[in-house]
Amino acid sequence: MTMQPSYPEGSTDRPAQSWTEVWLRAVTRPTVATYQDIATRPGVSSRRAYIWMFAGSFIAYAITLIGVLLFGGSSILGQQEAARIASDLGTTIVVLICIAPLGGVFAILGLMITAGISQAIARALGGTGTFTQLAYIIAAYLAPIGILTSLLAMVPFVSCLNLPVGIYSLFLNILAVKSVNRFSWGKAILSSVVILAGILLVVAFVVIVVLALLGPAIGNVFSNIIQEMGTPAP
């Protein structure tokens, strides 16, 4: 077995790692030392993190559609949706080409928002990391795990494993915040889970209130559109 050479932290002699090396280490060797090493190696950039999230989301969506074609009503999309998509391969390809890139864009936005809020809170609590480092680490584990969950969702009897995978992802998020910002577990949990969850709850509450206020108006608009679509042209 070949031993990898060790380099002092921050050394410029450490080589940049390929995406496969980074993903594998981030998912299978989650320690503070590992994450700090990944975050301080050459090649760390927000651009690379965004590419990973886009590619991971695209692949995950493609796997989901393939699952619909292979397993039909047993897939996560349900029997009616599965029958509709599986009945037309051409439609499936068009959906993949048109919608999957949009999912990749939303994945990037989600990474930017999550890493941005978590890092802002971490800095306020005395963290020393950067947004780029945190986004890079999060993308390094989130992209492959997203692909994994899509694979698990293809098989009904295995899809139940998505729950422990989700819990594991939450742990990796806390570990990423702690490793990048070099502070305690308590501050890491506060930065990555508690305050972020509070913000999301506030946003959800605001959305619910807005929808409740605008619900009747939105319903009337859709009702008029449906009526116009059902009315034959003169």
Listing of model-derived features with the role each one plays in the protein:
Residues D37-G43, R84-I93, N181-R182:
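Helix-boundary and loop/linker segments of multi-pass membrane transporters
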Residues V210-G230:
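Amphipathic alpha-helical segments typified by the pilin-like N-terminal helix
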Residues P232-P234:
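Short, solvent-exposed mixed-charge patches
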Residues A49-S74, T92-I117, Y136-N173, L190-L214:
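Hydrophobic alpha-helical transmembrane segments in multi-pass membrane proteins
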Residues W23-V27, T114-Y141, N173-I189:
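Membrane-interface segments at transmembrane-helix boundaries
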